[in-house]
Design a protein with these regions (language model features):
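Active-site/ligand-binding surface loops and adjacent short beta/alpha elements
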Residues: 170-172, 176-253
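Asparagine-centered strand-capping/turn motif at beta-strand->loop junctions
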Residues: 161-167, 304
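Short, hydrophobic/aromatic beta-strand segments
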Residues: 49, 57-59, 169-175, 312
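Short, Lys/Arg-enriched N-terminal segments with co-localized hydrophobic residues
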Residues: 1-8
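Extended, loop-rich substrate-binding clefts of extracytoplasmic carbohydrate-active enzymes
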Residues: 25, 30, 99-154
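Beta-strand-rich recognition/accessory modules
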Residues: 11-44, 51, 61, 131-136, ...
Length: 313
């Protein structure tokens, strides 16, 4: 079953539609913000707030939540949701003149372009779209069309971006899918696949290092950009492992605020810094460039078996 409308839809129409699109339901979530719930025939689910095109939940068929969202997160216009998968565009972090991580993650102008489901055993998709406006052009003077596709399967979640340059000048930007992976205790987690890579350590002013560990562990604050990272990484912890497969995004960011700074973070609950590790696919080390009329496509897939827990190696 498929729904598509080129002009996008506003909340009243979406609520009226929700009973007719089968496995994508649109409703009102926290903070009275519109939210889409994707349900796969296997029982897997995902939750996407239209505010920021923000994935806030992913549960494969085993029903276990794989993403972390803070209990103190703010759900309000102009605010970023703390956790899930924020879309950082057209700037990563403070690497430029725009607000931290750009405007996409706090925009309320995302529109539902289409929903679809392929029947038993297939996939459930939600496509959102954000275009330039007077507000975006005031801070980033470019014409663009950004599509974000969320695809749910029984044991995986894909998030894909397509950026079309709708203007007459080249676009340059940095970006990331700022994924907060849930972990029972960050100190017991390990990321596999980073050995041998060069990285920038932003806890030391961007100092350059080479990763020597086969399994990277986090004991406190970590803020690293791994350059030219492989497309397949794995998070191992006291639970089912999660694999991240990225597409057309060169870098990987590893981030946790650490206990010392967490106390000053108003939208992070007490002790919650120990319950996540950000493993982010991105174009961070150097800007991407899209010529007029061209389209850039990239994305990632998170997958997790529903087998017995894995333990860090």
């Amino acid at each position: 079953q498929t729904f598509s409308r080129g002009g996008g839809m506003h909340l009243a129409a979406l609520l009226a539609l929700s009973a007719n699109v089968g496995q994508v339901q649109i409703g009102t979530g926290r903070g009275e913000l519109p939210v889409a719930t994707l349900t796969h025939p296997s029982g897997a689910t995902a939750e996407v707030y239209l505010h920021g095109a923000h994935v806030t939940s992913w549960r494969p068929a085993d029903g276990v939540e794989r993403l972390f969202v803070s209990s103190a997160s703010r759900y309000a216009a102009g605010k970023a949701i703390r956790g899930g998968i924020p879309v950082c565009f057209p700037q990563f972090s403070g690497r430029g003149p725009l607000p931290n991580h750009g405007f996409a993650r706090t925009s309320s102008d995302w529109q539902v372009e289409s929903t679809s489901s392929d029947g038993p055993g297939g996939e459930v998709c939600l496509v959102l779209r954000l275009s330039d406006s007077a507000e975006t052009r005031a801070v980033w003077p470019h014409a663009f069309e950004l599509r974000y596709t969320v695809t749910l399967r029984d044991a995986s979640l894909s998030t894909d971006v397509q950026l079309r340059n709708a203007g007459g000048e080249p676009l340059e930007f940095t970006a990331a899918l700022h994924t907060y992976l849930a972990t029972p205790q960050v100190g017991t987690a390990a990321v596999v696949g980073l050995a041998g890579l060069s990285y920038e350590d932003n806890t030391e002013g961007g100092a350059a290092y080479t990763e020597l560990a086969e399994a990277v562990r986090v004991r406190g604050e970590v803020d690293r950009v791994y350059l030219d990272a492989p497309d397949l990484l794995q998070l191992r912890h006291e639970g089912p492992a999660v694999e991240l497969t990225k597409r057309n995004l060169r870098d990987v960011v590893l981030w946790n605020i650490g206990g010392e700074k967490a106390a000053a973070m108003a939208d992070l609950g007490a002790g919650e810094w120990q319950r996540y590790l950000c493993l982010e696919s991105g174009a961070v080390g150097s800007a991407l460039r899209v010529l007029p009329g061209e389209t850039f496509a990239a994305g990632q897939t998170l997958s997790s078996s529903c087998a017995a827990p894995t333990h860090p190696g």
